[in-house]
Amino acid sequence: MGQSTLIRAKVGDRFSIGDGCPLTLFGGPCVIEGEDFSLKMAESIAKVCDRLGVQFVFKSSFDKANRTSIGSFRGYGLEEGLRILERVKTELGLPVLTDIHESQQAATVAEVVDILQIPAFLCRQTDLLLAAAATGRTVNVKKAQFLAPWDMKNVVNKLRQGGAENLLLTERGSCFGYNALVVDFRSLPLMRELGCPVVFDATHSVQIPGGAGDRSSGQREFVPVLARAAAAVGIDALFMEIHENPDQALSDGPNMIRLADLEATLRQILRVREAVAEPIGASA
């Protein structure tokens, strides 16, 4: 792709992500934990982003369909979850993102959200990708933990063949033996060469899959470390799950950062990003 071609994705009619655009944060609790809590978290995160000049998309899941154990909390379900996300969108004026797990969910979810997210485990599911593409919404695809960054070209081709125009690709760590992930930061420029803005998922990258036996564990203390490294390599957006009290969260608490730590973390990332403000690419 020629260097004169701008790499951007539109988030509805709100803003763009990519070349020449401010950093965007995809942030919020892992799973929807209630209406009032979602509104409170969205408003609090939005205020931090406003102070720092960061574009903000609220994210939260209506269903965590791939929890480690059958007894883990999955969420409020499609209907109630979308109602809560729609309230965040309309009352706070924020764009929203959530993930879909089945093809038949795409059209319904797209009526509410601004960005459809394809989970990493499902990123090669052709029917799911085509259903998401058909909605006309922006699509964020998480690279599978088992997939090479250059193999994401096939995912991008499926979505483009399906009519998707605004695509984002997310790095969230790669399998490193059992119960461990490692981040290969080469994936960011390599995926960006596919013509899509790139996102770094700083919180799932510190996950320890199945590390607590019947649930995943994590090392949230390394979230700022990896986020700064990603900013140095070059990112268009940052994905971070955020909670008022992660130790009491209903899903992925060990990976999530505390709301109280968000502003300081973002300030560090912005300073790094500004210091290395050059085009992102893998070419020498």
Swiss-Prot record:
UniProt entry tagged with the keyword Membrane: no
EC number: 2.5.1.55
UniProt subcellular location: Cytoplasm
Gene3D superfamilies in the record: Aldolase class I
One GO location term (cellular component): cytoplasm
Keyword match ATP-binding: no
Highest taxon in the source lineage: Bacteria
GO terms (BP aspect): keto-3-deoxy-D-manno-octulosonic acid biosynthetic process
PANTHER family (UniProt xref): PHOSPHO-2-DEHYDRO-3-DEOXYHEPTONATE ALDOLASE
Family statement drawn from the similarity comment of this UniProt entry: Belongs to the KdsA family.
Protein name in the entry: 2-dehydro-3-deoxyphosphooctonate aldolase
Species: Synechococcus elongatus (strain ATCC 33912 / PCC 7942 / FACHB-805) (Anacystis nidulans R2)
Taxon lineage: Bacteria, Bacillati, Cyanobacteriota, Cyanophyceae, Synechococcales
Gene: kdsA
